Each structure stands twice: as structure tokens, then as C-alpha cells.
Amino acid sequence: MIYSRSKLPSEGEILIATVKQVFDYGSYVSLDEYGGLQAFLPWSEVSSKWVKNIRDVLKENRKVIVKVIRVDRRKGTVDVSLKKVTDDERRKKNLQWKKIQRLDKILELVSQKLKLSEKDAWEQVAWKLEAKYGDPITAIEKAVKEGEKILIDAGVPEIWVKPLLEEASKHAEERKVKMSGLITVRTNEPLGVEKIKEVISKALENIEQDYESLLNIKIYTIGAPRYRVDVVGTNPKEASEALNQIISNLIKIGKEENVDISVVKK
């Protein structure tokens, strides 16, 4: 379980959330980085484009990336937005979330070995490394390569140091794989470039949440009308499945938006 130093997030914070309940007027989500704290996602903050049915965008138990827009510290309530998260913020958060998950797994296993709680692990290891170095998992990986001094200098208690380094060495960052595909994209619609961007944006929605091993996705022109789709991840099977899903999404959404998309090579 992931523990945060603060009970409540701050306005503007970008977070991972799990959709719990969906209603016509909005959705309740739990904030994964705040112990499952409940937050409200209003209907007006779901999408910047008109959506007929909120359930076309939100599905229960799906993970989404949200931005905190209101915090009432007296009442302990939080409101979040889906539409205010930019593509760049979403990409960065996905990368950060993968690091957090790796950190959480290491701390879970080490705390079990020491017969201590996961909360102890977060308080005595993760939070101290965060205060000293900013990114706990990067600090741990550096300590595996350069030695325990990095942990000791941050104030990590000695009882954690050796088992932490032993476990972290088993969870070294996996080798990256890249899968690519070539497509052609054509449209006679007015504002064609904007229309193509819209199709691409829709096709990528939730892909990185659905495939946890993905690190990066890029779709870019290599000379109109040809575009390249690159998927980078640590699991070849998931990267291949994600590439196929993206291309399938592009073709389907393209038809709906009068954008002709065909596969050149996968």
C-alpha cells in the first residue's frame, strides 16, 4: 500500500485515481497515492468535448489520471478534473506511477522480511529518501550501484539498509523494448491537422493505464500522409498488444471523424 505524508492532496496535484462509482452527474474515485481517499469528479470536469454518456468515458475500476481542483481541508473533501490534465502531464505521471509501484513492491517485500509494517517502510525509508534526494526509487537504484552510504546519508535506519539493497537488486529496471507500426492518415475535413490530432488523442486514452509495462507512446509524421506509431515498454507481449490496440482505435475513431487511416506496416 502507498502512504503519503499528507492526509490530503494539494490543488494542482496530478494523481492516479481508480473509478469507483459512476453517476449521471459525475463520479466518485479513490486516490491511489492517498490511501484510497475518496474524491469527486464532476460531470463538467470529465471531458472538454461534448459526451453523450459519461459511461463512454468512465468505467468502474479503471485507473485514470486526474488533477486536483478543489480541497476543503476543514471538511476533508477533494474535487478532481479529468479534462484539465494535459497530454504532457499524463505522460509524466504514467512514468512516475510506474516508479512508485516499483518502490511500493520493494518496500512491501522488505517490510515482510523484517516483520515490520509497510507504513514503517514508507516513513523510515521512502520519506527520508524523498526529503534528501527527491525521488526515492532513483536513490535506491543508485545505492545498489554505488553503495549503502546513499541510504545512510538520508537517515535510513541501519536495520533497513542491507535487506533493502538485496531486494532492490532483484528489481532493477527491466530492459526496454520498442514496437513500431506505419500508418497513412488522410482527411478532407476543414482544419484537417486539428482533426487528426483529435483522433490520435482519443485513440491513446487509457492505453498506458491498461498496459502497466508501457513507458512511452509516440505517434508522429514521417512525411505526410505517413505516420509512425512507437510503443516502448518492458514487456514485449504487452507492447505488441498495445500497438495493435492503438492502431485499431485509430482506424475506428478515424471512421467516426471522417479521417481515413490504413496500415502500411506493423
Curated annotation (Swiss-Prot):
Keyword line: Initiation factor, Protein biosynthesis, RNA-binding
GO BP annotations, alphabetical order: translational initiation
Record's keyword annotation contains Metal-binding: no
InterPro entries with a match to the protein in the record: NA-bd_OB-fold, S1_domain, S1_IF2_alpha, TIF2_asu_arc, TIF2_asu_C, TIF2_asu_middle_sf, TIF_2_asu
Subunit structure: Heterotrimer composed of an alpha, a beta and a gamma chain.
Family to which the UniProt record says this protein belongs: Belongs to the eIF-2-alpha family.
Matches recorded under HAMAP family: eIF_2_alpha (MF_00231)
Role played: eIF-2 functions in the early steps of protein synthesis by forming a ternary complex with GTP and initiator tRNA.
Name of the molecule in the record: Translation initiation factor 2 subunit alpha
Originating species: Saccharolobus solfataricus (strain ATCC 35092 / DSM 1617 / JCM 11322 / P2)
